[in-house]
Regions:
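N-terminal signal peptide c-region/cleavage motif recognized by signal peptidases
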Residues: 29-30
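A short, well-structured edge-of-sheet supersecondary motif
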Residues: 66-104, 334-336, 341-345
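Active-site SXXK
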Residues: 82, 101-103, 110-139, 198-203, ...
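A short, polar/charged loop-to-alpha-helix boundary motif
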Residues: 93-109, 353-361
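Active-site helix/loop module of the DD-peptidase/beta-lactamase fold
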Residues: 110, 115-118, 133-174, 206-245
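Active-site-proximal alpha-helical segments within enzyme catalytic domains
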Residues: 194-201, 242-263, 332-347
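Active-site Gly/Thr loop motif
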Residues: 226, 280-343
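Structured C-terminal helix/loop/strand segments within mature extracytoplasmic catalytic/sensor domains
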Residues: 323-371
């Protein structure tokens, strides 16, 4: 804990509040994964749990899933300490071309395999932590140490100030076209093209491609057999591949984070200080953002759009303050709620309508089921 608080990015520690308290308890309890969490051996043998036995109303929980289906979800999986508490799948009617672009196939149970869009960023954040743990990088290294000069459209001097930490925190100071916008660390801007350079660094230091390193470091240990990086022929080269997976396999990833970086008895990522930093405010410009993860319970948040619009209050007001999330286009979601022992995954088409986004529609319904 002392090591974590000493990190320079946590000079804003007063804003962390319940998120840090819950996650610190979760991540420091190394016995939690061994004693309290269940890890499925395979999809064929994934235990379920009766919601009523762990404080949830079955009828109201079903109503929350009904709502998710009405909001164009293709799949929702809710885990309680690793066991499936609720799960449902839908066949989308008249899916948009955009959804069809993200649909990569189906598993043997006919469950959708989908490119999770920007939810992949949170997977890359974990890969960066593993690379640092293995001594391949330091997130405080300059990007140019690994990619040389000229990787952006900023001047050499401006570019030299940008670190991997800046890319993980979305405060590189680069505009979406990779030109200089502000000094590194001086402004927060959700910048997908800049983020993609994190993976380029990881491929460089690992000496292999993204599929191989992701398989070795994450998906193979977790049994995520349908998960891989897939090409996006419809996209610009800067975002030309996406992480594709199923709702169940994304839930496996969330369960590993819930277990503090462990899967069964295997340490996937052992650096608890990095995990705590990843799931806590990475800077003061947008306290609702960690290292490529979204964080609830903060004073305000900045949006992912080009204008980075400020919204006062929690990211998801109806959800517990300690929620952290992976979020992507078409409302791809993974929510982790330490205080409720939940991992919640949602895939599908855009679930936001009538000026109400999916988060603000789904979470009041889900929390109504809590007894």
């Amino acid at each position: 804990m002392q090591q974590f608080l000493s990190l320079k990015n946590l000079l804003i520690a007063d804003s962390i509040g319940p998120v840090l308290l819950a996650l610190t308890a979760l991540l420091s309890a190394t016995g939690l994964s061994a004693q309290s969490l269940y890890f499925p051996s395979s999809d064929e043998h994934w235990e379920q749990i009766d919601p009523e036995t762990v404080g949830w109303n079955t009828a109201l929980l079903s109503a929350a899933l009904d709502l998710a289906g009405e909001l164009d979800s293709s799949g929702v999986v809710i885990l309680h300490r690793g066991r499936i508490m609720a799960e449902r799948y839908w066949e989308l009617e008249n899916p948009s071309q955009r959804y069809q672009n993200f649909l990569q196939g189906r598993d043997t149970k006919d469950r959708a395999i989908e490119d999770v869009a920007s939810a992949q960023k949170s997977v890359v954040a974990v890969l960066a932590g593993i690379a640092q743990e293995r001594g391949l990088i330091s997130i405080d290294d300059r990007v140019s140490k690994y990619l040389g000069t000229g990787w952006s459209r900023a001047s050499e001097q401006q570019e030299a100030a940008i670190t991997i930490r800046h890319l993980l925190s979305m405060n590189s100071g680069l505009a979406a076209n990779m030109t200089y916008s502000a000094a590194a660390g001086g402004v927060w801007l959700y910048n997908t093209p800049a983020y993609h350079y994190v993976m380029r660094i990881l491929e460089e230091v690992a000496g292999t491609d993204r599929n191989q390193l992701t398989s070795e470091w994450i998906t193979e240990p977790l049994g995520m057999e349908y998960s891989s990086w897939t090409p996006r022929p419809w996209a610009d080269a800067a975002i030309g591949s996406g992480f594709s997976t199923t709702a169940r396999e994304l839930a496996r990833f969330g369960l590993m984070i819930q277990a503090g970086g462990r899967w069964q008895d295997q340490e996937v990522i052992a650096d608890r200080a990095y995990l705590e930093a990843m799931l806590s405010p990475s800077q003061g410009l947008n306290p609702a953002y960690g290292f490529l993860w979204w964080i609830n319970g903060q004073e305000f948040s900045l949006g992912a759009g080009a204008g980075a619009r400020r919204v006062d209050g929690s990211l998801i007001p109806a959800a517990p303050d300690d929620l952290v999330a992976m979020q992507g286009a078409l409302d791809r979601k993974l929510y982790l709620v330490p205080s409720l022992d939940l991992v919640v995954v949602r895939l599908g088409a855009t679930g936001s309508s009538n000026d109400v986004n999916f988060n603000n529609a789904f979470w009041p319904a889900l929390m109504a089921a809590r007894q």
